């Protein structure tokens, strides 16, 4: 039960990590699709910067450039707005005065005019100082966003690369060992694998030597030796055995016992195969001898039949010649006819003999097949 719960917890953690990675990848993809900053935003920022420079150039940048170049800006001529006083004879004695005259204006009015002028000048100065600060801030923001977009792209590539490597490592470790292992555990497993490989190589060498029969191993002596080692720990210390060495020795003993049992079974199977081969070879030899004897008997019978038939045909021809004392021409014609008949009879009789031989050979083959199909005696 605890193993299954641990596996479930691990699976849940892995699913969560994968979901978080997918969300990050989706956010980065959206950011890349937008291109960091869209085109209309960039156009808006550049337009604002151009307008700011156009507004500040005549009041701020142009005088600064002229000052750097050593040229003084042209001074605007001051216009005196105060009019000269009107002569009393011109009708100015009625008390009409110009408002610009400093002597006739009330002191409170003068203070209000001065305050208004100072406020207008202060507002203009603040506006002229805020515009360059605003432009500089916009430029810095633009540069910051550009560098940030590039940095995010590079970081995303690195993260994807390392995430892929981590996924590969995790999958390999999980598939091989069924869980997550640290570097120390992996190194320990590698060392154990090397030790097992060396032990297996030694086992194979000993098995080859046992198979060759050069160095036979006495299992009884090995069992006694192992019992002595288990009983006396001092003997172990004297020999220099450890737990790992004991395990290797036990594994070797078990492997040797199994090998001996397998070799015995293999020898038994070999003996059975040899016996079967010998019995089958003996039966084949007997069948061949029988067939050869039957064929020799058939040939002898054929040889005996042929001379008997020839003697019969010759005796018949001689008797006929004796019984017929005729003319030479008639005798010759009759002899030719008789010889033809004898040849035809002999040919017919020979064909019958061949057919009998074939039938006999077919019967023998059938008998052989029947014998081979019968179960062999072990």
UniProtKB/Swiss-Prot annotation:
- Ranges annotated as biased composition (Gly residues): 90-103
* Cellular compartment(s): Endoplasmic reticulum membrane
**Transmembrane segment boundaries:** 42-62, 127-147
Specify where the region named Sufficient for function in acetylcholine receptor folding lies, as residue ranges: 35-152
Keyword rRNA processing assigned to the entry: answer is no
Q: What is the species of this protein? A: Caenorhabditis elegans
Look up the record and report any one GO term of the cellular component aspect: endoplasmic reticulum
Expression tissues: Expressed in pharyngeal muscles, body wall muscles and in most neurons.
Q: What family is reported?
A: Belongs to the ric-3 family.
Query: What name has this protein been given in UniProt?
Result: Resistance to inhibitors of cholinesterase protein 3
The protein's job, in short, is:
Required for maturation and cell surface expression of acetylcholine receptors.
Biased composition of type Basic and acidic residues is found at 1-26, 355-367
Stated membrane topology is: Multi-pass membrane protein
| Start and end residues of each stretch annotated as Disordered | 1-32, 74-105, 155-179, 207-246, 267-378
The UniProt entry, under Pfam families, shows: RIC3
InterPro entries, A to Z: Ric3, RIC3_N
State the organism's lineage.
Eukaryota, Metazoa, Ecdysozoa, Nematoda, Chromadorea
GO process annotations (BP): positive regulation of synaptic transmission, cholinergic; protein localization to cell surface; regulation of muscle contraction; synaptic transmission, cholinergic
GO MF, any single term? protein folding chaperone
- From start to end residue, where is composition biased (Acidic residues)? 163-172, 281-304, 345-354
């Amino acid at each position: 039960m605890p193993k299954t719960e641990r596996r479930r917890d691990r699976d849940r953690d892995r699913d969560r990590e994968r979901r978080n990675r997918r969300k990050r990848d989706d956010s980065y993809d959206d950011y890349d699709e937008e291109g960091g900053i869209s085109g209309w935003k960039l156009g808006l920022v550049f337009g604002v910067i151009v307008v700011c420079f156009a507004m500040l150039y005549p009041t701020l940048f142009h005088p600064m450039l002229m000052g750097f170049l050593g040229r003084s800006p042209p001074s605007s001529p001051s216009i005196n707005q105060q009019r000269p006083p009107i002569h009393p004879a011109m009708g100015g004695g009625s008390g009409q005065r110009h408002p610009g005259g400093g002597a006739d204006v009330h002191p409170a009015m003068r203070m209000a005019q001065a305050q208004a002028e100072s406020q207008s000048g202060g507002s203009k100065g603040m506006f002229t100082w805020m515009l360059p600060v605003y432009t500089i801030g916009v430029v810095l923001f633009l540069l910051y966003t550009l560098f940030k977009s590039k940095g995010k792209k590079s970081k995303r590539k690195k993260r994807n690369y390392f995430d892929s490597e981590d996924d590969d490592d995790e999958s390999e470790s999980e598939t091989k060992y069924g869980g997550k292992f640290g570097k120390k555990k992996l190194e320990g497993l590698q060392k154990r694998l090397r030790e097992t490989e060396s032990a297996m190589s030694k086992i194979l060498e000993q098995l080859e030597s046992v198979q060759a029969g050069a160095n036979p191993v006495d299992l009884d002596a090995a069992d006694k030796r192992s019992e002595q080692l288990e009983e006396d720990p001092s003997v172990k210390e004297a020999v220099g055995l450890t737990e790992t060495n004991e395990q290797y020795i036990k594994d070797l003993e078990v492997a040797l016992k199994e090998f001996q049992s397998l070799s015995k079974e293999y020898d038994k199977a070999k003996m059975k195969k040899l016996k079967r081969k010998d019995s089958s070879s003996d039966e084949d030899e007997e069948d061949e001898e029988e067939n050869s004897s039957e064929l020799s008997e058939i040939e002898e019978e054929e040889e005996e039949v042929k001379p008997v038939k020839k003697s019969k045909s010759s005796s018949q021809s001689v008797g006929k010649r004796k019984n017929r004392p005729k003319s030479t021409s008639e005798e010759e014609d009759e002899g030719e006819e008789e010889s033809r008949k004898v040849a035809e009879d002999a040919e017919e009789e020979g064909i019958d003999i061949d057919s009998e031989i074939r039938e006999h050979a077919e019967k023998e083959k059938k008998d052989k097949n029947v014998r081979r199909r019968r179960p062999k005696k072990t």
